[in-house]
């Protein structure tokens, strides 16, 4: 141990280093101690609280102690970091030429840089891709490099960050020409670069090169290439790689699980996506927010909002903090499934959190509100859109279309016209969807002249009517009084001559049923599947409203023959049933008429009825009306004095016994069974 005299005679300058003591004294007095200073004068051990000192705190440190070495290293490390940051900034600021890059790096490194210095500069600089490659070459010539592949990997990573696939390929070729052997990190970087550049085929190609260079994929590589195979449409190979990774006992991590969930979702295998999510939890892997968002998106696409709610509750219970992507997934799921209350709750949370909501999300909400009759909620959303300062949130033509649809379905003519005027003032032209909704609105309100005026607007704008527009005109015709029906039929004629011919045969009381049967068969046989049932429903509604039951039955026969209505009647040993769910009122009454005639014919032929007969109307109600098919049918059955009564334990069913049905049928003539 050194003597006190040797310490006092130490020839070097005393070191004064400022630091926070590990156990500071509770005394507020400051200390400045140096062996070169004279002893301090005596002072009061308990100075007045009013006295204060701004003197900095210094403590002398023995230069031979470990603490001095640590402080010196910290000071040196701080200087090195600053020097490397300056070098990265200088590289970013210089031109992408060999001479400017060399000059900037030579100024930053008077002495040959280390390999770690080169890695830090290449990894942190924001230079152009060409400058990064030139800097790589300078470091390879001038730095103390032990493994050249490390610097190539860092440069490839920089090119990946800038999504420069062609530069990455060129650097790979340069690397091979120089005889540098790529490693796993090289392939992982190149594969993820291809994926980031939207080139999944290239990612797959590079993955398949790995065995040629003696490289085996690690978990990061598996994750990148599984996603690449999925994006390339080869879900089978992606999942086979996932199984291979598990077979090789790789530890599952959230990255690869999120990737596999996404692959399952993209291929439509939503059960598989959910299984991977449950499997990772069973393996002890805690899902992160990316995994939660991915599985929420998958379940939203699968139209499983109840699963979305469960996963969201789990996310919150795990104290994960939802982000904007989470709320977007929830909105997608709830609006697609028409879960109105849940969707509005998510929307209001996003508003409270002041999250950006673009016009796409707004339009999804408005479309949902229009479908389920959320008038006040839609008006709130539309006001928020117009009040937004962000141009990406302003209403577009789809926003106005949803609002017109909403008001049209509720019969709010003034509201629909007001939105149309706002739309025109905002610089948007009405499209076929808006005019379809507007015509439906005028039809509900009985304003036939406005229907004709709106149809003229369609012609003035040069819009070609589509089959949905024609279906809307059919709906309007079914509810139009006979004295104004010709105006609507004129619009139908100009929209579709074939449909107009069928309607004219239908409304002409003198025309026989057989020509109508043939014309309707040609029309419905060539129509798109999505509009065939609406056409049938509307045509039968029109026939029933015009008291043309024979023609309504002919239309039903055509629909059954073409398979438009299926399984309308079912028979078992214990029950014969009529299934009317999904039919319009006119189509349902027509089907009931035919069924009653069939029952009467069975009795006349001496057949035995089963113990139970039932009519299934479903229990749903029209979104914009308190009346559903069940309500209408209950009233109609009472008018007929039919013995069918609503089943207390089977919602939407009207049942009767064979005894009651037989008695009723025998007291009625077949032609009198249905009073329309």
UniProtKB/Swiss-Prot annotation:
Region annotated Disordered, chain positions: 17-58
Similarity-based family: Belongs to the PPR family. P subfamily.
PPR repeats: 148-182, 183-217, 218-252, 253-287, 288-322, 323-353, 358-388, 396-430, 431-465, 532-566
UniProt-listed SMART domains: SMR
GO cellular component: chloroplast stroma
Role, per record: Involved in translation and accumulation of chloroplast ATP synthase subunits.
Coiled-coil spans in chain: none
NCBIfam families for this protein: PPR (TIGR00756)
Organism field: Oryza sativa subsp. japonica (Rice)
Keyword Repeat among record annotations: yes
GO terms assigned for molecular function: mRNA binding; rRNA primary transcript binding
Listed InterPro entries: Pentatricopeptide_rpt, PROP1-like_PPR_dom, Smr_dom, TPR-like_helical_dom_sf
Presequence range in chain numbering: 1-73
Entry keywords, A to Z: Chloroplast, Plastid, Repeat, Transit peptide, Translation regulation
Localization annotation: Plastid, Chloroplast
GO annotation terms (biological process): chloroplast organization; chloroplast RNA processing; positive regulation of translation
Protein name listed in UniProt: Pentatricopeptide repeat-containing protein ATP4 homolog, chloroplastic
A Pfam entry, by short name: PPR_long
Domain Smr: from-to ranges: 578-662
Main subcellular location: plastid
């Amino acid at each position: 141990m050194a003597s006190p005299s040797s310490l006092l005679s130490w020839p070097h300058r005393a070191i004064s280093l400022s630091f926070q003591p590990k156990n500071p004294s509770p005394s507020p007095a400051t200390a400045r101690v140096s062996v070169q200073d004279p002893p301090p004068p005596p002072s009061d051990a308990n100075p007045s609280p009013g006295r204060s000192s701004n003197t900095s705190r210094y403590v002398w440190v023995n230069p031979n102690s470990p603490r001095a070495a640590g402080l010196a290293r910290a000071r040196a490390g701080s200087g090195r970091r600053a020097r490397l940051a300056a070098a990265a900034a200088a590289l970013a600021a210089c031109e992408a030429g060999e001479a400017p890059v060399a000059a900037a790096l030579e100024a930053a490194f008077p002495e040959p840089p280390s390999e770690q210095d080169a890695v830090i500069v290449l990894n942190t600089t924001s230079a152009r891709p060409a400058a990064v490659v030139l800097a790589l070459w300078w470091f390879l010539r001038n730095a103390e490099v032990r493994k050249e592949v490390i610097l190539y990997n860092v440069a490839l990573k920089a090119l990946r960050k800038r999504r420069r696939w062609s530069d990455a390929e060129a650097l790979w070729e340069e690397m091979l020409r120089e005889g540098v052997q790529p490693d796993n990190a090289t392939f992982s970087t190149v594969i993820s670069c291809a994926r980031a550049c939207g080139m999944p085929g290239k990612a797959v190609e590079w993955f398949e090169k790995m065995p040629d260079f003696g490289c085996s994929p690690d978990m990061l590589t598996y994750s990148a290439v599984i996603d690449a195979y999925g994006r390339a449409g080869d879900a089978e190979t992606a999942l086979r790689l996932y199984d291979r990774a598990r077979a090789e006992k790789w530890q599952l991590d959230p990255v690869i699980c999120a990737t596999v969930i996404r692959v399952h979702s993209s291929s439509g295998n939503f059960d598989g996506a959910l299984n991977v999510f449950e499997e990772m939890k069973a393996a002890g892997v805690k899902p992160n927010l990316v995994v939660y968002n991915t599985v929420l998106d998958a379940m939203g696409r699968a139209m499983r909002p109840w699963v979305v709610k469960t996963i969201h509750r789990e996310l919150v219970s795990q104290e994960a903090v939802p982000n904007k992507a989470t709320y977007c997934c929830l909105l997608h799921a709830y609006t697609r499934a028409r879960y109105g209350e849940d969707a509005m709750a998510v929307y209001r949370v996003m508003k409270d959190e002041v999250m950006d909501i673009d016009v796409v999300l707004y339009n999804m909400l408005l479309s949902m509100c229009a479908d389920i009759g959320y008038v006040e909620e839609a008006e709130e959303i539309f006001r928020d859109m117009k009040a937004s300062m962000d141009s990406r949130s302003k209403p577009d033509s789809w926003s106005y279309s949803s609002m017109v649809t909403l008001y049209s379905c509720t019969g709010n003519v003034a509201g629909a016209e007001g939105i149309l005027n706002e739309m025109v003032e905002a610089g948007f032209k009405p499209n076929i969807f808006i005019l379809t909704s507007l015509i439906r609105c005028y039809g509900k309100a009985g304003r036939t002249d406005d229907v004709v005026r709106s149809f003229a607007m369609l012609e003035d704008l040069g819009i070609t009517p589509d089959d949905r527009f024609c279906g809307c005109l059919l709906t309007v015709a079914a509810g139009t009084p006979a004295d104004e029906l010709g105006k609507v039929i004129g619009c139908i004629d100009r929209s579709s001559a074939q449909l107009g011919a069928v309607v004219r045969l239908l409304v002409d009381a003198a025309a026989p049923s057989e020509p109508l049967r043939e014309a309707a068969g040609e029309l419905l046989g060539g129509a798109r599947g999505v509009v065939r049932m609406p056409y049938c429903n509307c045509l039968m509604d029109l026939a029933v409203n015009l008291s043309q039951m024979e023609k309504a039955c002919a239309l039903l026969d055509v629909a059954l023959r073409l398979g438009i209505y299926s399984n309308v009647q079912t028979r078992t040993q214990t029950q014969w049933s009529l299934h009317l769910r999904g039919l319009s009122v006119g189509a349902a009454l027509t089907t009931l008429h035919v069924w009653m005639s069939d029952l009467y014919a069975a009795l006349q032929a001496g057949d035995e009825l089963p113990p139970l007969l039932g009519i299934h109307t479903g229990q749903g109600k029209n979104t914009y009306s308190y009346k559903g098919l069940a309500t209408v049918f209950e009233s109609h059955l009472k008018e007929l004095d039919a013995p069918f009564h609503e089943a207390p334990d089977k919602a939407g069913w009207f049942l009767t016994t064979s005894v009651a049905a037989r008695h009723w049928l025998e007291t009625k003539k077949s032609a009198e069974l249905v009073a329309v």
